[in-house]
UniProtKB/Swiss-Prot annotation:
It comes from Jannaschia sp. (strain CCS1). Keywords: Ribonucleoprotein, Ribosomal protein, RNA-binding, rRNA-binding. GO terms for molecular function: rRNA binding; structural constituent of ribosome. Belongs to the universal ribosomal protein uS4 family. PROSITE patterns: RIBOSOMAL_S4, S4. This is Small ribosomal subunit protein uS4.
Amino acid sequence: MTKRTSAKYKIDRRMGENIWGRPKSPVNRREYGPGQHGQRRKGKLSDFGLQLRAKQKLKGYYGDLTEKQFRRIYAEAERLRGDTGEFLIGLLERRLDAVVYRAKFVPTVFAARQFVNHGHVTVNGQKVNIPSYRVKEGDVIAVRDKSKQLAVVLEAVGLAERDVPDYVDADHSKMTATFVRTPGLSDVPYPVVMEPNLVVEFYAKN
């Protein structure tokens, strides 16, 4: 198992949930966290604990973002007028690696980050290798011709465990995807419950 795959499943174990809905997640087989103390029964979380957990789960889902990365995105959402939690979700879903994942060009969000980093993707015909690149409505994301037959791409397209959401218009025959619109929380096909409202509460108090 690669370090990247190990890190992904460690997040699942830490959260106690299969946050990406993967069949091989270890939490499908056991109900405790990682490490030697993982089998201890967890007590009821405080309000702070619930807020922290909501933040950690959302950070983890998008590839285990660093606190600095996540806090910067949150600060941008907070500056917008309206529902900060909804804006936070929209900004996260506009990351290029998130769109590559949603389009089913790759099997995991971790693979999406690596795929973009290695220069396999274009946006409106121009190569972009920055996973955090902010996609706009109408942008066309494509897998470069030389990358279309990579095993990771062929595996992802055939995955039955998740569908492409309606805010991404993917054409797998051409390996292109148009970002149609910025989604809200109810539009995003999270396999588990995400609570951006608790993330807002966390940052309001800390």
